[in-house]
Amino acid sequence: LHNLDGVQIRWVPTPNSKKLNAIVYSFFATVRALFGGYDIIHFHAEGPAAMVPLAKCFGKKCVVTIHGLDWQRAKWGGFATRFLRFGERMAAKYADEIIVLSASMQQYFADTYHRQTVRIENGIDPPETADLSPLSRFGLEKDGYILFLGRIVPEKGIHYLIDAYRTLQTDKKLVIAGGASHSEE
């Protein structure tokens, strides 16, 4: 048992198998939560949400946060895609509440599952004044660039951004910044 800023962290050991790690981890974490004395289990993402029916069998309240439609991501295929869609359906059918991060995701659940969701968008507390010194390091000026900031993965459609930028008549520079996904791609 570890503690981080007043939050207890409980480790759930799983076998080291890339292909099944997420499924096995979700199962073991759910079983541990079932017997941990918790009133509510909060599942993050579609894959872990496949375990919601198990938790409901034990009378637990379940909240699921859907961060995106993971099954649409290019890194998944075959069984993983089907499992993620299964988890999405289990969340829609059995979760007490579903949290989504955008209006489009909220509409997706309404259209696809006739399911109401709670939208809580990601946000930040912007600094009162921005430090513009990093701009000069890259030859950029305030309001002189178009910025993409996010994971650099195929499903973000950065190639469409580049194609669209090439058609613009602008003096603004295109800046693409971000990291890769946690996948091996």
Where are each of the predicted segments found?
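A short, charged, and often flexible helix/loop element on the N-terminal side
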Residues: 5-31, 73-80
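A short, histidine- and acid-enriched strand-loop-helix "catalytic/donor-clamping" loop
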Residues: 17-19, 35-38, 49-50, 63-80, ...
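Membrane-proximal helix-turn-helix segments that form the acceptor-binding/catalytic region
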Residues: 31-34, 57, 80-98
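Short His-centered aromatic/hydrophobic patch
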Residues: 43-48
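Carbohydrate-associated surface elements
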Residues: 104, 123
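Glycosyltransferase donor-sugar binding loop
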Residues: 124, 149, 173-185
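A short helix/loop element that forms part of the nucleotide-sugar donor recognition site in Leloir-type
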Residues: 129-140
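A conserved mid-protein helix/loop that constitutes part of the nucleotide-sugar donor-binding site
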Residues: 144, 153-167
